[in-house]
UniProtKB/Swiss-Prot annotation:
Signal peptide positions (record): none
Pathway annotation from the record: Secondary metabolite biosynthesis
Name of the protein in its database record: Acetyltransferase sphE
EC code: 2.3.1.-
Disruption of the gene: reported phenotype: Leads to an increased accumulation of sphingofungin B.
Induction of synthesis: Expression is positively regulated by the sphingofungins biosynthesis cluster-specific transcription factor sphG.
UniProt KW keywords: Acyltransferase, Transferase
Alphabetized Pfam families for the sequence: Transferase
Uses described in the biotechnology field: The sphingofungins A, B, C, and D, show a limited antifungal spectrum of activity but are especially effective against Cryptococcus species, fungal pathogens causing opportunistic infections in human.
Entry keyword Acyltransferase: yes
């Protein structure tokens, strides 16, 4: 809950009169996005040409409104954030921070790079695994993976003339690491996907395939509450909005149990789930639904890999954490609303290059007992029904109106449920297709024979997400993506004390598979 924190900021650099000044979009200037920065590292099993990558990204920022990526962040007189976009970029004011270094060794021989997940070893082993990531917070690792002097907190951007994007390219004898760093206020992961697609198109010499940048000055999420039909539909959980003493009680529990006592005792780790395990769980879930006759006229008999993955992980967390069986579980599942924005006519299409934060959440409320005792298919189907019920234009408009009203009037995020609920949150990046990023046009030579790997030339075999958080993130995480072999990669934050219980559950899955 970073919105409860206050601090003094250094004086910002002087305003450059030729800069284009644009107010932040509403959901980009949010306590959550302001308090989180990302370092997304792509491991490519080939040796890439750093100069080709740099030149392609520089060229992209010269194309139309794509120069907004090079904006500087300032605070206006009212306290809101705004972009100062240079008219052009040069050595004094570059469009992005950049650095590169080459090592005459393999990845496995470098003291920092060797600590990253080893995708080919994990894929060959075929077992679920948990990898410690506490090393990513060490000064040695951060100085290795990030561009030097590039900010990692909002205050760093405000007191400097730093661009929003940082790029670090590290080459080895057998692979290349490409790290893209940015403050979450710039975009969500679907927006990052748009940036990577455009960068790749320029790299291939296909500027004609670069989509027009959407939302340079206009906020496509503005006016969502202007419904096509009146009256505006009621949000499905409107009656459970925490206000007054209920919000105060929830906030007090959060501050006392997490912010004051647990924040420094939470740990973030990478979870590797082989393709076969999720396939087996989904097949079993579908069989359970069929046997129970879960199909009804309104909801098709279907659960996706994402539904099953979230249901499984929620069960893993609850088994390790052991909350009271009667307690309510709030499963918060984020979704991209670009298709709905296109349906409402706010953007040209669902696949346009919209670089902003356009995510909302669907909520599924069950008891701890239900998640632990009912078959996995039951929980997955409840998640699916929540998506169908809430992921539509009418519910998005209703939710957006409540969230804005709560933030503007009560000055805290809108929360739904009950004050004693247990929350498990997941953001699924699979649709961002990060494992399909194509840097093949920059390949100098192969680092690994294509016959010995699943990923294609110039595409990542592993993606690691790290960063800096200005608030506690316990029981929060992401599905980084699905690699070329169909394996899933997660990054999740839990209490340090319960990770051994999580690891034991994943070990049991391996033993059951071997039996």
């Amino acid at each position: 809950m970073g919105f409860l924190r206050f601090g003094r900021e250094s004086a910002p650099p002087p305003t450059v009169q030729s800069d284009t000044i644009i107010p932040f979009h509403y959901w980009d200037d949010d306590h959550h996005t302001r308090g989180l920065s990302f370092d997304v590292t792509f491991r490519v099993d080939d040796i890439l040409d750093p100069e080709k990558l740099r030149c392609a990204l520089s060229r992209l920022l010269e194309l139309g409104d794509w120069r907004k990526l090079g904006a500087r962040i300032r605070r206006n007189a009212e306290g809101g954030l705004e972009y100062h976009v240079p008219q052009c970029f040069d050595d004094k004011r570059p469009g992005f921070a950049y650095s590169t270094v080459a090592y005459d060794m393999n990845v496995a021989d470098h003291p920092q790079a060797s600590r990253l997940a080893q995708p080919h070893y994990l894929d060959a082993a075929g077992r679920p695994a948990v990898q410690d990531t506490t090393y990513t917070a060490t000064p040695e690792f951060r100085s290795f993976i990030r561009t030097p002097a590039f900010p990692d907190r909002l205050e760093g951007w405000l007191r400097s003339d730093s661009p929003q994007l940082g790029v670090r390219i590290i080459t080895f004898l057998d692979a290349t690491l490409v790290t893209v760093s940015f403050l979450h206020s710039l975009t969500d992961m679907m927006g990052l996907d748009a940036v990577l697609d455009a960068w790749s198109a320029v790299l291939r010499g296909r500027e004609d395939e670069v989509k027009s940048f959407v939302g340079f000055a206009h906020d496509p999420l503005a006016g969502l509450t202007e419904s096509k039909t009146e009256p505006l539909q009621k949000y499905v959980f409107a009656d459970t909005l925490l206000l007054g003493w209920t919000w105060f009680w929830f906030a007090l529990r959060y501050i006392v149990t997490i912010e004051l006592f647990w924040q420094h005792r939470e740990e973030e780790r990478v979870i590797f789930l082989p393709a076969k395990h999720l396939q087996q769980m989904r097949s079993k879930a579908m069989a359970e639904l069929t046997a129970r006759g879960a199909h009804d006229s309104d909801t098709p008999l279907f659960v996706s890999e994402g539904d099953v993955l979230f249901a499984w992980w929620t069960r893993v967390v609850l088994r390790a954490e052991k909350p009271d069986p009667s307690r309510t579980v709030n499963m918060r599942n984020t979704y991209c609303c670009r298709s709905i924005l296109a349906e409402l006519g706010h953007i040209p299409s669902a696949t346009c290059a919209l670089v902003t934060n356009a995510v909302f959440a669907t909520l599924t409320f069950l008891s701890v007992r239900q998640v632990l005792e009912e078959p996995l298919g039951f929980t997955a189907f409840e998640i699916r029904k929540s998506l169908i019920q809430q992921r539509n234009a009418e519910q998005l408009q209703a939710l957006d109106r409540i969230q804005r009203k709560t933030l503007d009037n009560a000055h805290h995020p809108a929360l739904f449920g009950n004050p004693s609920m247990y929350t498990v949150m997941m953001s699924n990046w699979v649709k961002a297709k990060l494992f399909q990023v194509d840097f093949s046009a920059a390949v100098i030579r192969k680092g690994m024979a294509t016959g010995k790997r699943s990923n294609q030339l110039g595409r990542p075999s592993c993606i690691q997400g790290t960063g800096t958080k200005g608030y506690a993130t316990r029981n929060t995480g992401v599905v980084i993506g699905k690699d070329a072999a169909g394996n899933f990669w997660l990054l999740y934050s839990l209490r340090k004390e319960i990770w051994p219980a999580v690891e034991q559950q994943l070990l049991s899955m391996s033993l059951d598979d071997a039996a």
